[in-house]
Curated annotation (Swiss-Prot):
The keyword Mitochondrion does not apply. One of its GO terms (cellular component) is cytoplasm. GO terms for biological process: DNA replication, removal of RNA primer; mismatch repair. Manganese or magnesium. Binds 1 divalent metal ion per monomer in the absence of substrate. May bind a second metal ion after substrate binding. Belongs to the RNase HII family. CDD domains: RNase_HII_bacteria_HII_like. Residues 29-220 form the RNase H type-2 domain. The gene is rnhB. Its EC number is 3.1.26.4. GO terms for molecular function: manganese ion binding; RNA binding; RNA-DNA hybrid ribonuclease activity. The keyword Manganese applies. InterPro entries: RNase_HII, RNase_HII/HIII, RNase_HII/HIII_dom, RNaseH-like_sf, RNaseH_sf. This is Ribonuclease HII. It is found in: Cytoplasm. It comes from Rhodococcus erythropolis (strain PR4 / NBRC 100887).
Amino acid sequence: MSSWPPRVVIRRSAGLRTMESALARTGLGPVAGVDEAGRGACAGPLVIAACVLAPKPQAALARLDDSKKLTERAREELFPAIKRLALAWSVVSVPAAEVDQIGIHVANIEGMRRAVAGLDLEPGYVLTDGFRVPGLTAPSLPVIGGDGAAACIAAASVLAKVTRDRVMTEMDETHPGYGFAIHKGYSTPLHMDALDELGPCPEHRMTYANVVAAGVRLEQRAGRTG
C-alpha cells in the first residue's frame, strides 16, 4: 500500500535547508515557508509573507536566519536578495482595523492563506512558523521556531519584518508623537507613555486591553479638566 503524502524522513544535513531537502527528496517540492511580523504589536498592521527558495543554496542568502536574530542592516541587505533570488514570494498586510474585527489569530491564519495563494507558483508543501494553518491548497507542517529551522520560513520572516518596519517608519510621519519608527508599534515604555499622553490613533488596535485602557484614562483626564 502507498500513502500520500509520502512519509518524510528528516536527516542530519546542512542547517536551515534540512526540512526543504527532506521534502524535496520525497517529491513534495517546491516548498513554501510562511511567517508573520507584528503579531505582538498593539499598533500597525499584521504583515505575512510566503517564500519559495531555489533548491540549491545561494551565497547571497548564506546569512539567512530568524529575522529577530538579525541586525536591521543584515535584514535590509537580505531583503532585495531574497526577492531577486526566490522562485516566488508574496507579502500580505492585514490592517489594524481588520485585526480588531476578526481577532489576531484568525487574521494570522487568513493572512497566511492569502500569502500562499499570492505566490506565482503552486507549492507542493508549506512550512508554517509555529502553528497549523487549515485551508491551504497544499499539505503543510507547523514548525516550532520555524524561522530559525527552515530557510524558506527564515526568508519569509525577513520579507515580513522589513516590509512592516518600513510601514511603521512611514506611519511615524503621518502619526507623529508615538515613536512608531523606534518601537514599530510594540508595547515598549516609550510607546505606552506616548499612548497615555496622546490617546490612541487610527492605527492602534482598538480592541487591545492596553489601548482601551489608555483611551479610558485620556477620557477621564479630559473629564476632570472639562
